[in-house]
Structure formats: C-alpha cells, structure tokens
C-alpha cells in the first residue's frame, strides 16, 4: 500500500484500519 496514501494517517496494514498519528 502507499505509505502516503492518506494525509495525516499512517499506512494501512493488512486488514487493519489506518492509524491516526497526526490528525490535529
């Protein structure tokens, strides 16, 4: 998966939801 697919979100893992690491 693209690591920068979601701005402000960590890359999606296999079957896991995106992790919010910088949403503020």
From Swiss-Prot:
Q: Which domain of life is it from?
A: Eukaryota
The entry's comment on post-translational modification says: Glycosylated.
> Which GO molecular function terms does the record list?
calcium ion binding
Stretches the record annotates as Disordered: 1-24
Q: Which UniProt keywords apply?
A: Calcium, Glycoprotein
Q: Which interval of the chain is the signal sequence?
A: none
GO BP terms: shell calcification
* Tissue expression: Nacreous and prismatic layers of the shell.
The question of whether Protease is a record keyword is answered with no
Q: What else is known?
A: On the 2D-gel the determined pI of this protein is: 5.6 and 6.7, its MW is: 50 kDa.
Query: Main role?
Result: Calcium-binding.
Q: What is this protein called?
A: Calcium-binding shell glycoprotein P50
Instruction: Tell me the organism.
Output: Unio pictorum
Q: What is the lineage of its organism?
A: Eukaryota, Metazoa, Spiralia, Lophotrochozoa, Mollusca
């Amino acid at each position: 998966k693209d690591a920068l697919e979601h701005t402000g979100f960590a890359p999606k893992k296999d079957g896991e939801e995106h992790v919010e690491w910088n949403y503020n």
